[in-house]
């Protein structure tokens, strides 16, 4: 998977954390059997920036931990007829994730686990949203959260 990571925070994340998130999302992509030509972006921001995005796109005037903007919503697809070999070469853009590093630190402290664990949790949570998972209904929540746990545990990021 082609993963572009941008760090727009005032205190840049350590390379070790950036690499951990990159490796974790690559692991998650393999767990979901995504094709290698899948692409997405992840941008780390501070609370003021994620608050702006949350207000602009969700009409919620407060900072949040993670925002996911899927490139395509389920059912948006218009069928295109093309040669299967050509279709396999066209990149599949999942969309864009934004994670507030301020919220990562706050929530890790509140929940009593490491910053790496919270960072990984939010990255996988947003990644699953980009792949069509949600937690609006109890059955969907159970399915998404089970997969989230399996990915985090399989990667070795336990509580």
Curated annotation (Swiss-Prot):
Query: Which PROSITE patterns does UniProt cross-reference here?
Result: UPF0054
Q: What is the lineage of its organism?
A: Bacteria, Bacillati, Bacillota, Bacilli, Lactobacillales
Q: Which GO terms describe its molecular function?
A: metalloendopeptidase activity; RNA endonuclease activity; zinc ion binding
Species whose genome carries this gene? Limosilactobacillus reuteri (strain DSM 20016)
Q: Does the keyword Metal-binding apply?
A: yes
Name of the protein described by the UniProt record: Endoribonuclease YbeY
Q: By its UniProt entry, which Pfam families does this protein fall under?
A: YbeY
Q: Which UniProt keywords apply?
A: Cytoplasm, Endonuclease, Hydrolase, Metal-binding, Nuclease, Ribosome biogenesis, rRNA processing, Zinc
Localization recorded for this chain is:
Cytoplasm
The EC number(s) given in the record are 3.1.-.-
In the record, the note on similarity to other proteins reads: Belongs to the endoribonuclease YbeY family.
The yes or no answer to whether the keyword rRNA processing is present is: yes
Role this protein plays: Single strand-specific metallo-endoribonuclease involved in late-stage 70S ribosome quality control and in maturation of the 3' terminus of the 16S rRNA.
Gene Ontology biological process terms, A to Z: rRNA processing
Q: Coiled coil: which residue ranges?
A: none
Main subcellular location? cytoplasm
The cofactor note reads: Binds 1 zinc ion.
What the entry lists under InterPro entries is as follows: MetalPrtase_cat_dom_sf_prd (IPR023091), YbeY (IPR002036), YbeY_CS (IPR020549)
> Looking at the record's lineage, which domain of life comes first?
Bacteria
Which sites bind Zn(2+)?
125, 129, 135
Cofactor(s) needed, names only, are: Zn(2+)
The residue range of the signal peptide is none
Q: Which GO terms describe its cellular component?
A: cytoplasm
């Amino acid at each position: 998977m082609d993963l572009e990571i941008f760090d727009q925070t005032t205190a840049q994340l350590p390379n070790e954390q950036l690499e951990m998130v990159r490796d974790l999302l690559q692991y998650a992509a393999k767990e979901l059997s995504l094709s290698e030509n899948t692409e997405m972006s992840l941008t780390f921001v501070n609370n003021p920036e994620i608050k702006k995005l949350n207000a602009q796109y969700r009409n919620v005037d407060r900072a949040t931990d993670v925002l996911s903007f899927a490139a395509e919503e389920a059912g948006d697809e218009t069928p295109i007829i093309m040669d299967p070999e050509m279709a396999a070469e066209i990149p599949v853009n999942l969309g864009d994730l934004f994670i507030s590093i301020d919220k990562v630190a706050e929530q890790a402290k509140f929940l009593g686990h490491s910053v790496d664990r919270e960072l990984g949790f939010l990255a996988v949570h947003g990644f699953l949203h980009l792949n069509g998972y949600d937690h609006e209904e109890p059955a969907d929540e159970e399915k998404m959260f089970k997969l989230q746990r399996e990915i985090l545990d399989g990667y070795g990021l336990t509580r």
